[in-house]
Amino acid sequence: GETRVAKDWQELQGRAFELASGSSGREPFELDREPMALRERYGMNPLGQNLLLARRLVESGVGFVTVNGWTGPAPGETGGGPPSSSWDMHGGEMGMGNAFGTGSYGMGWCLPRLDEALSALMVDLDARGLLERTLVVCVGEFGRTPRINAQGANPGRQHWPACYSAILAGGGIRGGAVYGQSDKIGASVKDKPVRPQDLGATIYHSLGVPLDLQVGKDGFTRAISSGQPLLSLFG
């Protein structure tokens, strides 16, 4: 007969097919249902519209949404690098232009799009009563070198995992809090270091997942997290 694992797999497969093929699964992706003024508030570019889509997915009951930080061009707008290269601000020797300018790899291009889209998401979630039960995490996998690696027309910075920042909002996080501190050039952590597992534990805490939850079988059982949640961030 069928095992429990096989039955679970069939059930999940059926639910996934229903989600992908049914009208309830398609509707969140129909962004033209939104007022144009709201779409423009997010920004008529890939990042803005993807964050609007994320809100619609959350509103429809999706429990976990990941949005790539691609700051590509709006329709009819020139510029914008490929999706794999947003925020890849190495500078001239990588053929990516000035990391501090307004070109498609520059902070003058990327940051305004992020500011516009992320702030619109926060306001929109809050207005719909969704922010308190939705944790928003904005983070990359590393920072950038504190010292500029190239001079001249196209300066930039290399990868720097030793010190960087993340933004958390909603999900019980109290607004306006700052946790930790770097030195004055952002080279190293000066106060309250946070490890990746601590960030993970903080996310689990926000979602109500017990940190002593055991996962894995057949000799590989382990706690779901080895980190410590940053409890002072919660109001």
Language-model-detected regions and their locations in the chain:
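Ligand-binding pockets and gating/stacking loops
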Residues: G1-G235
